[in-house]
Amino acid sequence: MTIGIVVFPGSNCDRDVHWATQGCLGMSTRFLWHESTDLNGLEAVVLPGGFSYGDYLRCGAIARFAPVLSSLLEFVNKGGKVLGICNGFQILTELGLLPGALTRNQELHFICDTVPLLISSQRTQWFKNYNQSKNIFLPIAHGEGRYQCSESILKKLQDEDSIALKYKNNPNGSINDIAAITNKSGNVLGMMPHPERAADKDIGGIDGIKILQALLSN
């Protein structure tokens, strides 16, 4: 089973994801250039962090038109797993696979830190193997990570148990402390924290490993 890692012009976390999945966990991976439309043979796809297309106009606004994402819509509809990390989460909202939007941080500056997170839902495979009573610690690095949505969308996320992670100490002003959400089916996860930067105990802890392992779990 193989994971596809999408590479956009301006991406800078695709190699990090490759190292965490293949280098640390021994998973088979394949880089997908943004112009590719062939997702055959893939179990899951990762949209990594970075600054796709320089984040001009708005984070993820240009990336959403990449040819690879047309194929991604069909991939998701067939049940394929998709993980969007940071800029990847922004792209998923622009694409309409996840509701809401990511906006400028409340204090209007870039945040780079390791933060405690609360597992808000174990409904999906992504977080089933975590102890919900314990915080996990993952790095964040973003200037536009403040999750925003309407009250009706927030209620829907709550009713569907789709809020996956919450910040314990909200660093960016996200509504309801939201750090990660899933779609109703649970096969799409968007998150601002970086699990790939917490997959090696020597360089940042291992709290992200189980999220990455879920890419290939049934």
UniProtKB/Swiss-Prot annotation:
<dbReference type="InterPro" id="IPR029062">
    <property type="entry name" value="Class_I_gatase-like"/>
</dbReference>
<keyword id="KW-0963">Cytoplasm</keyword>
<keyword id="KW-0547">Nucleotide-binding</keyword>
<keyword id="KW-0436">Ligase</keyword>
<feature type="active site">
    <location>
        <position position="194"/>
    </location>
</feature>
<protein>
    <recommendedName>
        <fullName>Phosphoribosylformylglycinamidine synthase subunit PurQ</fullName>
        <ecNumber>6.3.5.3</ecNumber>
        <ecNumber>3.5.1.2</ecNumber>
    </recommendedName>
</protein>
<dbReference type="GO" id="GO:0005737">
    <property type="term" value="C:cytoplasm"/>
</dbReference>
<dbReference type="Pfam" id="PF13507">
    <property type="entry name" value="GATase_5"/>
</dbReference>
<keyword id="KW-0658">Purine biosynthesis</keyword>
<comment type="subunit">
    <text>Part of the FGAM synthase complex composed of 1 PurL, 1 PurQ and 2 PurS subunits.</text>
</comment>
<keyword id="KW-0378">Hydrolase</keyword>
<feature type="active site" description="Nucleophile">
    <location>
        <position position="86"/>
    </location>
</feature>
<dbReference type="GO" id="GO:0005524">
    <property type="term" value="F:ATP binding"/>
</dbReference>
<dbReference type="InterPro" id="IPR010075">
    <property type="entry name" value="PRibForGlyAmidine_synth_PurQ"/>
</dbReference>
<comment type="pathway">
    <text>Purine metabolism; IMP biosynthesis via de novo pathway; 5-amino-1-(5-phospho-D-ribosyl)imidazole from N(2)-formyl-N(1)-(5-phospho-D-ribosyl)glycinamide: step 1/2.</text>
</comment>
<feature type="active site">
    <location>
        <position position="196"/>
    </location>
</feature>
<comment type="function">
    <text>Part of the phosphoribosylformylglycinamidine synthase complex involved in the purines biosynthetic pathway. Catalyzes the ATP-dependent conversion of formylglycinamide ribonucleotide (FGAR) and glutamine to yield formylglycinamidine ribonucleotide (FGAM) and glutamate. The FGAM synthase complex is composed of three subunits. PurQ produces an ammonia molecule by converting glutamine to glutamate. PurL transfers the ammonia molecule to FGAR to form FGAM in an ATP-dependent manner.</text>
</comment>
<feature type="domain" description="Glutamine amidotransferase type-1">
    <location>
        <begin position="2"/>
        <end position="218"/>
    </location>
</feature>
<dbReference type="GO" id="GO:0006189">
    <property type="term" value="P:'de novo' IMP biosynthetic process"/>
</dbReference>
<keyword id="KW-0315">Glutamine amidotransferase</keyword>
<dbReference type="GO" id="GO:0004359">
    <property type="term" value="F:glutaminase activity"/>
</dbReference>
<keyword id="KW-0067">ATP-binding</keyword>
<dbReference type="GO" id="GO:0004642">
    <property type="term" value="F:phosphoribosylformylglycinamidine synthase activity"/>
</dbReference>
